[in-house]
Amino acid sequence: MAGITKPQPQKGNESAAGEAVAASACDGLTQQTGNACAPGSTQNAHANAADADDARGKPSTFANSAGAGCEHDADDARFMRRAIELAWRGAGWTSPNPLVGCVIVREGRVIGEGWHERYGQAHAERNALADCALRSGQGASGQLASHDDPAHGCAQGATAYVTLEPCCHTGKQPPCTEALIAAGIARVVVGSRDPNPLVAGKGCEALRAAGIRVDADVLRAACDELNSVFFHFITHKTPYVVAKWAMSADGKIACAAGDARWITGPEARADVHELRHRLAAICVGIGTVLADDPLLTCRRDTPGSQPVRVVLDSRLRIPEDCALVRSCSEGAAPLIVATCAPVADEASPDAAKAKRLASRGVEVLSVAPDAAGRVSVSHLLAMLGSRGVDSLLVEGGAGVLAAFFEAGAVNEAVAYVAPKVIGGAEAPSPVAGKGAPCMADAVALGRATSDVLGDDVKLMFAPAGSARVASQTRIALKAADDWHASAAEGGAPCSPAS
């Protein structure tokens, strides 16, 4: 199986135009370290210093990796924040491509903006240039030949603010660098640097060679956070893992008798479906399947993308009539059952069951066992990565969460806490397993952030070296609030696009 992609409706809330490069949407400046979004890196120290200056409205100057000085002021930060807000709109739709936003500005006024809306469709830069033409009445679309100007001459001398360095290679469509050059863009302001080794900075080089001024690392930390999934996947070739659970105020995920519906309220449960929409795959253990018979689908008020469903089932106990298996013949998202059972042994009953499951559209994935005879988390992640799965939401149960934490595979954790006390020594907690033998061996999750969802609290934890996917709603809303506040003060020349 060459790759797995999330099935998506033809249209959600977003409109789209054009085609996208099937591999990376943008490739960037050379990264010397594996994870470009590590908060402790030197590059992010520059970015955070710059962000602090932006907040004070002061110019910031620092060297980028090409050795050139980078200067930007409060206006640059403001327009980049708008590009970030636009980029978040593609969350859940662009995988395995990155999230990218672009704003075109001339003389302090926004003349075009766009974002990478869906995998297989136009990139942010071409959408923004096409928007320039639409706003000026110059044509109905930016779907032009590779060397044509999507902006129809409307972007001459303008500045393009892009959250990720523009791509410079040819895939399903020409490079975005060519579109920016053809449009007569005079300056490109870049937020993040792409760790994709295919181009290693050639995008900025191509723009500079064409006489375009390029300033990098504007709001670098915030732009890096946009693409923590993409950066992790492009450098590690394994999914970015988010562990999630819901619990009572005393740390219980169910009553002693097993009743767990519902710990949290409707607002928290709706937020879980946002996570399912944004991440490429969802994982549970066979115990959850046997107890709850779930579908593991994304159910939002508006159409969402559906995650690939993964069940850890070391002994292939999954019922052939369960909701997950039945849904495979109804056009639902792909279902992968990861097992250590001897499915390759033709004489084994497991082999016959695996064939029956396969005939119904289930992929039975044979995975090496760990020391305890369970599905090896590290082997599973490598196999999912080879199938193009760039992110994984681990929803439990407690044994599965323990396996991922014990394997050191969790990039981020999300806990929904309800104002209830369940009590009872036998009531389960979120993470099972042997546990830490002493406090020094406990898994450190780093500083927490929180959101209030109805009566519940959402806690988001990112271990050192990881950015936060689950907090993206908060970031996007803050970016929009900043923009509207600036507009109220007369600083923003136009309102954000709807």
Question: Residues of each region from the PLM?
Answer:
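Zn2+-dependent cytidine deaminase-like catalytic core
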Residues: 106-222, 308, 341-347, 403-405
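Residue-level signal for inorganic ion chemistry
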Residues: 83, 101, 167, 207, ...
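Short beta-strand scaffold segments in enzyme catalytic cores
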Residues: 100-106, 245-246, 459
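Short, basic/aromatic recognition patches
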Residues: 75-95, 233
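Flexible, gly/pro- and Lys/Arg-enriched active-site loops
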Residues: 406-445
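Active-site ligand-binding patch in enzyme domains
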Residues: 138-150, 232-236, 240-249, 253-390, ...
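Conserved histidine-centered catalytic loops in small-molecule metabolism enzymes
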Residues: 433-498
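Short gly/pro/ser/thr-enriched loop/turn and capping motifs at secondary-structure boundaries
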Residues: 195-198, 221, 290, 317-319, ...
